[in-house]
A protein has these predicted regions:
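Active-/binding-site microenvironments in catalytic and ligand-binding cores
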Residues: 1-138
Length: 138
């Protein structure tokens, strides 16, 4: 049960996976790395770091451009689309695409945001699924 709103504010849930060098990525994609380029403990005046990662590292939302050349780029999508109340549907089936029958008996009318919780969230961070859920054309 979500917490009650406090003084007109709602609780913000962090649904992201922790980014680390052991986090599994799409086969062939760039893994996360973090390195210091300067360190104060080695005499530098500041700490500086370098991050290397794919935009598909960890929890993320794919823009339409990810799957079609004429789709909208991420920068064209308003951030407001990703912030606000959301409805969560859990789909326990571990194989195949997400189909309309997965939502049978659920009232989804008027929703602005739908989050789909699947078994992939329960995998260890270093394991990439052989078969993962995806929305079908239906």
């Amino acid at each position: 049960m979500p917490p009650e709103p406090t003084r007109g504010r709602f609780h913000l849930y962090d649904i992201s996976r922790t980014i680390s060098p052991t986090l599994a990525v799409w086969p062939g994609d760039t893994s996360f790395s973090f390195d210091y380029t300067l360190r104060t403990e080695e005499g530098a005046s500041v700490n500086l770091t370098t991050l290397t990662l794919s935009p598909h590292t960890g929890s993320h939302a794919d823009a339409p451009y990810h799957i079609t050349a004429d789709g909208a780029h991420p920068a064209a999508l308003p951030l407001e689309r990703y912030i606000g109340p959301a409805h969560v549907v859990t789909i326990d089936r571990q194989h195949g695409g997400i189909v309309p029958d997965d939502f049978a008996g659920r009232d989804l009318t008027g929703l602005e945001r739908l989050l789909i919780h699947t078994w992939v969230s329960d995998l260890p961070e270093d394991r990439w699924p052989d078969d993962f859920p995806y929305p079908t054309v239906d």
